[in-house]
Amino acid sequence: MKLLMLCREPNLYSCRRLKMTAENAGHKMDILDPNRFLLKIQENRPHFALYYQPNQGTPYLLPDYDAVIPRFGTQSTKMGCSVLTHLAAKNIPCLNNPASFALARDKWLSLQALAAANIAVPVTVFAGQDFQAGSAVEKVSSPTILKTLNGSQGIGVILADRSQSAVSIMETLTLSHIPVLLQDFIGEAGASDIRCFVIGDKVVAAMQRSGQKGEFRANCHRGGITQQITLSDDEKLIAVRAAQALGLDVAGVDLIQSKKGLLVLEVNASPGLEMIEKTSGIDVATQMIAYLEKKIAGL
Ligand SMILES: Nc1ncnc2c1ncn2[C@@H]1O[C@H](COP(=O)(O)OP(=O)(O)O)[C@@H](O)[C@H]1O
Ligand SMILES: [Mg+2]
């Protein structure tokens, strides 16, 4: 098969692993930067054309691919999802599909979708820019978490110890036209959460993450320490339901243990492979490529 990965940094562990694994399975894989595409909608068939601007040389018409794996970061969500939509319109299987990918990249819309599917999430509010910050902050508990809608790797997640701090941070962000959601802080989790790697209807690997000393964010990119973990059936079920609620084939589901029970913090559409493979000892890349092969075959 001829596979395409959409990614700006081909040297990242996840990209290298996926490319190597695909090639070992006898496939060819090109890695292209979504920001180097030109997308065209035209009258004549094929209605959807794509051109690519290589590093050196002139742009060329994109050849056909059998499937595409989106692995672009949050800085490229808009163009990346546009490229993905164009490829999906040409009936090229996408791991994940463009609508689900875009939904997962918006923290508020995805929490709404999770709640609509009866999946427990932390109490969260999203206020319009003209809603009084003080009244918005009163709707959640203190200390309060504030999150920008499309942050990642822990960036854009803020802990305000006092209500007054939450109000001033919210006012500052709103004035800067940065939409933000407010959320109950789950302090009882002790800066730990669980990352579940879901492929299809299975959790293929999981790990516990704990924030380093003095840090409430458990993200590996923020220095979080990882540990092997065996999930209960209940935890597995919630993770798979969360991925399915957003329509994702591949997802990194973050779970947090609160005093009210297990909650879904967020669902990532392009979860990293490095720490989950190294911590769990499971070859996640091979399972992703095997799943993609089945998807291409229409199984
Ligand atoms: N409501 C919360 N209560 C306690 N900790 C939280 C909460 N929300 C996020 N965190 C911590 O911050 C980390 C990053 O938050 P998350 O919503 O997953 O955003 P990101 O996309 O940046 O990973 C989580 O892994 C968790 O450790
Ligand atoms: Mg996260």
From Swiss-Prot:
Binding site for Mn(2+) 2: E266, N268
UniProt-annotated binding residues for Mg(2+) 1: D254, E266
EC number from the UniProt entry: 6.3.2.-
Annotated residues for binding of Mg(2+) 2: E266, N268
InterPro entries: ATP-grasp, ATP-grasp_RimK-type, ATP_grasp_subdomain_1, RimK, Rimk_N, Rp_bS6_RimK/Lys_biosynth_LsyX
Binding-site positions, ATP: K147, D184, F185, D193, R217, A218, N219
Residue span(s) of domain ATP-grasp: 111-293
Note accompanying the cofactor annotation: Binds 2 magnesium or manganese ions per subunit.
GO BP, sorted A to Z: protein modification process; SOS response; translation
Residues spanning the signal sequence: none
Cellular component GO terms, alphabetical: cytoplasm
Enzyme class: ligase
Top-level taxon of origin: Bacteria
Cofactor: Mg(2+); Mn(2+)
Record-listed Mn(2+) 1 binding positions: D254, E266
Ligase keyword on record: yes
GO MF, any single term: metal ion binding
UniProt keyword Manganese present: yes
Keywords: ATP-binding, Ligase, Magnesium, Manganese, Metal-binding, Nucleotide-binding, Protein biosynthesis
PANTHER family, per database record: RIBOSOMAL PROTEIN BS6--L-GLUTAMATE LIGASE (PTHR21621:SF7), RIBOSOMAL PROTEIN S6 MODIFICATION PROTEIN (PTHR21621)
Family under the similarity heading: Belongs to the RimK family.
Protein name (Swiss-Prot/TrEMBL): Probable alpha-L-glutamate ligase
